[in-house]
């Protein structure tokens, strides 16, 4: 029978997703067939499978670490917040409906059968399934309808490792407090504790670990150091938005929209020597830069209103006057147009809003969501400044509710040739006459090595800088990072004990 291991945390952002990825890689290295699983995920960063189905980005990342293709079975429920009180519910990769938190709480018991079926499918195909919890198991107000923490552990009879984040302080109290709030049968299921994100001399920490073990009557199975690994993160509560690369000939500013989604689009840019990538957060100014990128968003109209409220639109217009490059991805592409219409008020209470007017397109928000993996070719009649991009083949994915229509003589940016493996011929995106402004629906476009190299060299040439000859292969880079992650965690955790724990719970 299949072995199981569940990773729960004392809070959100303690490092559960990365540790699950680490376990997936370790088990793969040890010769096991392994898959990740998270019954319910809340995130704006998502991934499109080969079948055109949408799951949480973290489970796709964990599947990569496990060396397998991402599947909707790994994340049967995905919640994508569209406002403080509403979320889009995605079941098995397809949009179900928009729902309030209160409605969803009542709806959860109906999802148990679906969750169990998807877990059982993965268990039938693999030697080990590594399960990720969400937030904290000690949310006692949600206990009676829990489908993602202890409810999930009990449903699958999985042992639990509890993770605490020492970097933020208060790790001993958070671990002891979490255990205190659990029922006795839930406490008994926790087979060990992991201290994550440790910096400093572990000898100083050891007396505290011994005292903690005496208090909670659980073994600390490992202390994982704060890791400098570059792997896709999932949600927006991340340090990346406040990091600053201090050196670089080319400066790229990404607008951190209130409902920014798929910000992993820009991670490949941060890996290129000579690139200074930064995010423009609320209250900050774009300042002097070479490229402005407006990213994807779960609420295009609401985020465009925020962009105008913070007067970021005025700065974008100023960048346009200065001849800087302005790029829009997905929702950011929609914002660059003349108008965005939402007649059904699907995304907001506003039925129509004026766009930034930098591209001659209009967008209509529709009920039907486009979710596809794509192959495309950059068009061969781009303006001369972008001529190095002509005819470059790219791969990526689409996730959007709206459809954009080109007005006037504005030219498309690319031609989509395949959607979910089927041949098509569909124009994508739009580009200004001078080539300094363009938008596309293609997420992941900067992961294409040739495209990103040529685009960066275009920007470098515009500044009188010499071209870069080669850049990192992002897929190979990620593989090395997964191995690095596994190596660090393997050295930090008592893996022999982890295997023994899993064996004790073998059905």
Curated annotation (Swiss-Prot):
- Supply the Pfam families for this chain: CbiA, GATase_3
Q: Where is the GATase cobBQ-type domain?
A: 249-451
Q: Name one GO biological process term.
A: cobalamin biosynthetic process
Kindly give the InterPro entries that the UniProt entry links to this protein. Answer: Class_I_gatase-like (IPR029062), CobQ/CobB/MinD/ParA_Nub-bd_dom (IPR002586), CobQ_GATase1 (IPR033949), CobQ_N (IPR047045), CobQ_synth (IPR004459), GATase_3 (IPR011698), P-loop_NTPase (IPR027417)
| Domain of life of the organism encoding this protein | Bacteria
UniProt entry tagged with the keyword Hydrolase: no
Keywords (alphabetical) are: Cobalamin biosynthesis, Glutamine amidotransferase
SUPFAM superfamilies given in the database record: Class I glutamine amidotransferase-like (SSF52317), P-loop containing nucleoside triphosphate hydrolases (SSF52540)
- Catalytic residues identified in the record: 330, 443
Q: Which family does it belong to?
A: Belongs to the CobB/CobQ family. CobQ subfamily.
Q: Which HAMAP family match?
A: CobQ
Functional note = Catalyzes amidations at positions B, D, E, and G on adenosylcobyrinic A,C-diamide. NH(2) groups are provided by glutamine, and one molecule of ATP is hydrogenolyzed for each amidation.
- What is this protein's name? Cobyric acid synthase
Organism, scientific name: Thermoanaerobacter pseudethanolicus (strain ATCC 33223 / 39E) (Clostridium thermohydrosulfuricum)
Organism classification, top ranks?
Answer: Bacteria, Bacillati, Bacillota, Clostridia, Thermoanaerobacterales
